[in-house]
From Swiss-Prot:
Domain of life of the native organism: Bacteria
Coiled-coil segments: none
Protein's UniProt name: ATP synthase subunit a
Taxonomic source organism: Rhizobium johnstonii (strain DSM 114642 / LMG 32736 / 3841) (Rhizobium leguminosarum bv. viciae)
Database matches in NCBIfam families: ATP_synt_6_or_A (TIGR01131), PRK05815.2-4 (NF004482)
Length: 250
């Protein structure tokens, strides 16, 4: 049902594909993930293809994003963190573009799918673990041993640190998924109120004013949330990468 606020999150097959009994179908989620990546890459290519000393609008926006992520990385993970700039910048642009695409009517919000946000979170944590062991070997395990902890408290603190580390991909994925899901459901509910009351004619139009105002206000808020969630995802990624670069430095 179109009135169902959760209907917008249903994954639907566009091109059914099954190989060896495994479903590889191209879905609306696949389409908008590809579109998000293509739009982000296309914008950056267009913005930087004709670079000038006096930047145009698109180049200015691209430079703002570049400096924004570069500053975030150096502050969160030090100068060595810049080696991860392509990863963090790509994640930020993908999440931001996917969030913004989901704001358009009849478009699909891929970041409202826990499987998508979980895959992004696993990519981040996997990078942290692989790089940590590659760079530091078993000294990477110092990330679970904060400096200055009394020996008597060490077993308890190490246990807490391990649990905290293992919960990172969960919190990173659920935070993005839950915020996008809740925001879009709320928008759908208020928009449904407007449509239902407006269908009652002159009597319902007056009652639809308040839900309409709320819908407009929530739409503006959701655009802000779309950026903030991409920002938070990038910030946390930088913090986690710092543990791989400087284990035991917290």
């Amino acid at each position: 049902m179109s009135s169902d606020p959760t209907h917008q999150f249903l994954i639907q097959k566009i091109v059914p594909i099954e190989i060896g009994g495994i479903d590889f179908s191209f879905t609306n989620a696949s389409l908008f993930m590809a579109a998000s990546a293509a739009i982000a890459a296309g914008f950056l290519y267009f913005a930087t293809s004709n670079r000038a000393i006096v930047p145009g609008r698109s180049q200015s926006v691209a430079e703002i994003f570049y400096e924004f992520i570069a500053k975030m990385l150096t502050e969160g993970a030090g100068k060595q963190g810049m080696q991860f700039f392509p990863l963090v910048f790509s994640l930020f642009m993908f999440v931001l573009t996917a969030n913004l695409l989901g704001m358009f009517p009849y478009f699909f919000t891929v970041t409202s799918q826990i499987i998508v946000t979980a895959a992004l979170a696993i990519l981040v944590i996997g990078t942290v673990v692989v790089y940590g062991f590659y760079k530091h070997g078993f000294k990477f395990l110092n990330v679970f041993v904060p400096s200055g902890v009394p020996g008597i408290l060490l077993p308890l603190v190490v246990t807490i640190e391990i649990i905290s580390f293992l919960s990172r991909p969960i919190s990173l994925s659920v935070r993005l998924f839950a915020n996008m899901l809740a925001g879009h459901i709320t928008l759908k509910v208020f928009a449904g109120f407007v449509a239902s009351l407006g269908a009652l004619g002159a009597v319902g139009v007056g009652g639809a004013v308040l839900p309409l105002i709320m819908t407009v206000a929530l739409t503006g808020l959701e655009f802000l949330v779309a950026f903030l969630q991409a920002y938070v995802f990038a910030v946390l990624t930088c913090m986690y990468l710092n543990d791989a670069i400087h284990p035991g430095g917290h």
